[in-house]
Amino acid sequence: MKQEIKKDDISGLSFEEALKQLEVIVENLERGDVPLEQSIDIYERGEALKNHCDKLLKVAEAKIEKIQLSNNGTPEGVKPLDPE
């Protein structure tokens, strides 16, 4: 079943929405029945979606971890932002 890959604005997508679109792209490319030009277009969109997901994951990670500094100010590890 072919699904249309829309060229909408990636930056407004949630992590889950972007991941779902990325899964559709991978499925279409793995099937191998997509014309070459379309494969290139959807591959490029897949790269943009992957980068968007990476960015969102880094933001989430920054919210839950805080860098621990040693006495001389150098980083020595991370700890939960709000330990309970």
UniProtKB/Swiss-Prot annotation:
Subcellular location(s) per record: Cytoplasm
Keywords: Cytoplasm, Exonuclease, Hydrolase, Nuclease
EC nos: 3.1.11.6
Pfam families in the record: Exonuc_VII_S (PF02609)
UniProt xrefs under PANTHER family: EXODEOXYRIBONUCLEASE 7 SMALL SUBUNIT
Protein known as: Exodeoxyribonuclease 7 small subunit
Protein's job: Bidirectionally degrades single-stranded DNA into large acid-insoluble oligonucleotides, which are then degraded further into small acid-soluble oligonucleotides.
Organism this protein belongs to: Bartonella bacilliformis (strain ATCC 35685 / KC583 / Herrer 020/F12,63)
A single cellular component GO annotation: cytosol
Keyword Cytoplasm applies: yes
Primary subcellular site in the record, as a coarse category: cytoplasm
Reaction(s) catalysed (UniProt annotation): Exonucleolytic cleavage in either 5'- to 3'- or 3'- to 5'-direction to yield nucleoside 5'-phosphates
InterPro entries: Exonuc_VII_S, Exonuc_VII_ssu_sf
S-adenosyl-L-methionine listed as a keyword: no
An individual GO BP term: DNA catabolic process
Assembly and oligomerization: Heterooligomer composed of large and small subunits.
UniProt similarity note: Belongs to the XseB family.
Gene3D superfamilies on file: Exonuclease VII, small subunit (1.10.287.1040)
GO terms of molecular function: exodeoxyribonuclease VII activity
